[in-house]
Amino acid sequence: MSPTARKSPARVVVVEDSLVQRAKLVAVLEADDDIRVVGEATTALEAIALVASLRPDVVTLDLNIPDGGGQFALEQIMANTPTPILVLSSTVSDKSSAPAVEALVGGALLAVPKPTQWTAEFESELRRNVRTIRDVTVIRHPRGRLGRLPMRPSRLSSLPRAATSSSRVNRAESCVVAIAASTGGPQALATILEGLASLKAPVLIVQHIHPDFANGLVDWMARVSPLEVVLAVHGQTLRAGCVYIAPGATHLRITREWRIELVDTPVTVHRPSADQLFESVALHARERGVGVILTGMGDDGAAGLAAMHRSGALTIAQDQATSAVFGMPQAAQKLGIVDQQLPLPGIAAAILRGAQSRTPVPS
């Protein structure tokens, strides 16, 4: 392809049972010359069959559809015809955001709430998201295994779980673990946290996610993690064995006293920003930091991880083979500041080793 040649339009299947919403969505997408709607489905069974026959570049999926629901359609599509999926969810309250989070765990690349009013800004962002994810290589997900993981209490209750009264961290005898993720992150984070039951250090996480789904992410992570998981609150003192998730649209940082600092000003394009977290850990934890950059689009976190590397912290990046999207880890890799590039299943053990090596033995 010559430098001036254009890609063919992104072929999209729209899954939406509301005639009004479906017509609006099709019109919004096809206002972009680089997007073409090639099929429309109103039920889960129609969606599964249509994706299998048309092999589109992208699927937009409503979760509230007949014949099994959007989660069922997603599981079947990702098990049999893996396709980049953008979930449009009308469930945005704290209690009802769980389906959108489970969709992300089950393989959807993005989840956004349906607007009450379709603004030009939302429509433009929607088209941009479709164009962005069209070229993502998605992996096959075993049917039903990933998205339904949180709903297996028998399995989760068998995991060792940290006491909810986690002790205040002793800065002289501990370290700080900072993790950043974007597209594909919830599944990767769950895999890592399940292997950190014995960790005696605080964990701070930046996950790029729509603000409406942040509380749902915390609730879901709390069900699958052996550690205590909380939404970060400004001024909190870091506690060993506690996982702090950045609130939606808010930067998560630590202070010199190892307290939580939340900043809601738009310092960077991303909010929360991985760079903001990593840079604060580099400044205030220095060689007692462990930085981890996971799957995700773009380059957020690369500069911050470089700062951690310069300060003597351990830096870890997910490898390409196990990343849903290799953008963020690759950006860090290109800077030459990654100490260990690892497949997802090996990252938890590397964090434990790194934390132990950075924790002084009391005399």
Describe the residue ranges of each PLM region:
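Conserved acid/base catalytic micro-environments in cytosolic active-site loops
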Residues: 1-11, 18-30, 34, 40, ...
